[in-house]
């Protein structure tokens, strides 16, 4: 049993990672709009989004910036920090949205998997390569866990020039958290934690930009991402 809990998470991807080869800098925004329309109702301003360095002339820049948000958060988590960084670098900017996040239905977070999130990250990196010659990655919390995994894989992290990891999630503090990456994790979480997890938002903006109440199953891919980064 101890050996099972030490094994890395199984990355059985159910979605093809990366970006279709036919997507160009001219078609990337329509592509994202089509993909996001399939996700369900996304809260205002929280969809995947490109901020062009020159909106009047959308074109490739020397550097691109991509932002990977944390668990239960959204692309708006650290704004305007990524915007300011991109502006200072004269870079195009891409905000990804990890599956299950930023949706009107909070239960959607419980349906996301680790494979979904690594696919979203790989897509973000591919878009970063499309938008710029080299990529600056900014990531927070569990987003930083995913980026740490990617940095160890040259094929995934190709053309990454710099990374900024804000409060990276390299360990779940709750006692017994290792159970979230082992057998029967969902059943154990229900018994120990209950059916749902969440927090009280401090204001309306916090409530909008975060999923503040979600199924306990959502903790499983978060814990797996931490293990993946180890």
Say what each PLM segment does.
Residues 164-175:
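Active-site nucleophile loop of the alpha/beta-hydrolase fold
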Residues 103-131, 136:
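Catalytic nucleophile-loop/oxyanion-hole region of alpha/beta-hydrolase
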Residues 49-59, 209-230:
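Serine-hydrolase catalytic core
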Residues 41-98:
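Short, surface-exposed "cap/lid" segments of acyl-processing enzymes
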Residues 97-102, 169:
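Short beta-to-alpha linker loops that shape the active-site pocket of alpha/beta-hydrolase fold enzymes
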Residues 1-26:
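N-terminal membrane-anchoring alpha-helices
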Residues 138-147:
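Gly/Ala-rich beta-loop-alpha elbow adjacent to hydrolase catalytic centers
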């Amino acid at each position: 049993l101890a050996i099972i809990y030490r094994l890395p998470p199984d990355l059985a991807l159910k979605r093809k990672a990366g970006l279709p080869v036919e997507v160009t800098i001219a078609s990337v925004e329509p592509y994202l709009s089509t993909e996001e329309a399939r996700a369900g109702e996304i809260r205002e301003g929280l969809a995947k989004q490109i901020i062009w360095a020159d909106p009047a002339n959308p074109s490739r820049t020397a550097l691109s910036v991509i932002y990977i948000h944390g668990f239960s958060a959204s692309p708006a988590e650290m704004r305007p920090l990524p915007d300011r960084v991109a502006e200072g670098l004269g870079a195009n900017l891409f905000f990804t949205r990890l599956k299950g996040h930023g949706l009107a239905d909070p239960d959607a977070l419980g349906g996301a998997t680790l494979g979904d999130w690594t696919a979203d990250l790989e897509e973000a990196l591919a878009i970063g390569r499309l938008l710029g010659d080299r990529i600056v990655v900014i990531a927070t919390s569990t987003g930083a866990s995913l980026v740490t995994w990617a940095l160890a894989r040259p094929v995934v992290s190709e053309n990454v020039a710099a990374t900024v990891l804000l409060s990276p999630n390299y360990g779940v503090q709750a006692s017994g958290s290792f159970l979230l990456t082992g057998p029967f994790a969902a059943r154990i979480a229900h018994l120990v934690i209950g059916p749902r997890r969440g927090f009280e938002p401090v204001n309306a903006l916090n409530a909008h930009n975060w999923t503040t109440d979600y199924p306990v199953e959502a903790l499983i891919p978060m814990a797996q991402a931490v293990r993946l980064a180890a």
